[in-house]
């Protein structure tokens, strides 16, 4: 007689623990002693342009949920572009292929304004639910789609929902991508190891603390309700930046056009940029430029 009861983790042998822990792990730090043009701190602003795909990825067809995603390209992106343009700040937009295909002019306009377009899955799928061949196919197709639309081959990836499978790092390394921005082992860039071996892929780490969705997502049917006022979120982001500045490191921020792009919320980013601009020795850069500089100078 067989049973599907999982083996208790406290009975796992050390070899199994090491295999799991070392599949994708942080290697050596790539923190440079100084940044481009002698800047003390690098600032990388990023936006995940999920748009309609957040509803579509699991087969959802809710017109209400789709309309919420469509707020991103209709209202959020224009507000973000204007704010970045007024402050001469380059940023990185992680774009699911389906979003890029349905909003191609948006991607071309962002490229024309000096921003980076990077990988964010095909339809914001969860990688841990895919077999390796499917994940590999979708990642290659996504890169091809973004290149066709923008004319530039993406060099970086952020996995949808930061969902990182056992196959993700190997596929990313096989594709020769410069960086990933989905993991959280540090505040500075570091090299990613696959089964203990260097991959050549640089990690530009993220954190839920520095993600607008962690504070502002509303789930109509679930228990998620925004409980933090915009002013308080701003103070968290300012404290994160101030610490990064004192350490001479990176201030990385993850945002979403359909979240931060609302009128009462874009204020957070506007005020944050104003605070950062009070410091003269700042390098605003795309994630690709930060990862590349860190790898060469760290």
Model-based region annotation:
Residues 224, 228, 232:
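A short glycine-/small-residue-rich loop at the edge of a beta-strand within enzyme catalytic domains
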Residues 203-224:
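Glycine-rich, positively charged active-site loop/lid region within alpha/beta enzyme cores that binds
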Residues 221-225, 252-258:
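Short, local alpha-helical segments
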Residues 2-156, 161-209, 231-253, 261-298:
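Catalytic alpha-helical scaffold of carbohydrate-active enzymes acting on polysaccharides/glycoconjugates
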